[in-house]
Regions:
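Gly/Pro/Ser/Thr-rich low-complexity, intrinsically disordered segments predominantly at protein N-termini
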Residues: 1-248, 252-271
């Protein structure tokens, strides 16, 4: 039994000034799966980890999480349709960014890991944080911010010093503010310098990191709009014939699901 297992941790009275071991960090996050803390009135079920310090991650309000899910949805569709066969993670998908040899666990709102990185991972890397560190190539944070305020400065520092740290594979990052309708794009110059550009609220492409991917901001607006909308996938008298096989369908949704599963989502051995 590990030393951390023998050490009684009072989840409700954590000391955020002390240095925790990595084993204690893992134990705390494991206990938080069935326990919720409140810090400054905000519910917390997950911590990040930086040089022994616990960094609370408050739960996302519904609109922020909905935006992150919509970005993930568009990214997942691109991943399937272009047969990238990579991995997309959401807001509890943590990575060890290994800053200056220090274990640094950060969870981005959305991340993409190419298939060549994922397929090279060993068992420990896949199922624990104890293997050799690896990072995604693309990260997204969703937040309501104002340039110059504390949260914006903290996120800007997170992009520059954590996500784009020396040795990180991250080549593209987006800070998405759906309320103020701004997207901040982070890239790394060939010199290694990280720079930020303001993109406004326009469709944005994935550069060479996500070839062919375009984030459509209107779909984000539609997702969090409180105006009513109706699905057009109801059954009708007309049938839809699949152009690649003999299957027929009575609604758009079933046809699209069939087309993706049977024709678009073909993962070939050896890819």
């Amino acid at each position: 039994m590990s030393k951390a297992s023998n050490h009684k941790l009072d989840i409700d009275n954590l000391d955020f000034k002390r240095i925790y071991t990595f084993e204690e960090f893992e134990l705390i996050n494991e206990q938080l799966k069935t326990h919720t803390l409140k810090i400054d009135g905000n519910p917390v079920n997950l911590f990040e980890f930086n040089e022994g310090k616990l960094l609370p991650m408050p739960q996302n309000p519904i609109s922020k999480e909905a935006v992150a899910c919509e970005i993930s949805r568009q990214l997942c569709n691109w991943n399937v349709h272009t047969r990238q066969n990579g991995i997309i993670t959401a807001s509890q998908g943590g990575f060890d960014f290994d800053i200056s040899g220090q274990r640094t666990i950060r969870a981005t709102d959305v991340a993409f890991i190419p298939k060549n990185i994922y397929r090279s991972l060993d068992h420990q890397q896949q199922w624990t944080f104890r293997g050799q560190s690896f990072t995604p190539t693309f990260v997204v944070e969703v937040a309501v911010v104002q340039e110059g305020n504390r949260e914006f400065n903290d996120l800007d520092k997170k992009f520059r010093e954590i996500y784009f740290a020396t040795g990180s594979s991250v080549g593209l990052g987006w800070l998405v503010d759906p309320k103020n309708k701004q997207i901040y794009i982070y890239r790394r110059r060939v010199t290694g310098v990280v720079y930020r550009t303001l993109h406004g609220w326009n469709n944005v492409d994935g550069d060479s990191i996500l070839p062919g991917f375009i984030l459509k901001v209107q779909k984000i607006d539609d997702t969090i709009s409180q105006e009513s909308s109706e699905s057009s996938s109801s059954e009708s008298d007309e049938t839809i014939d699949c152009p690649k096989c003999n299957a027929t369908f009575s609604n758009d949704y079933d046809f699209m699901e069939h087309y993706e599963d049977s024709h678009a989502r073909k993962w070939h051995k050896g890819e």
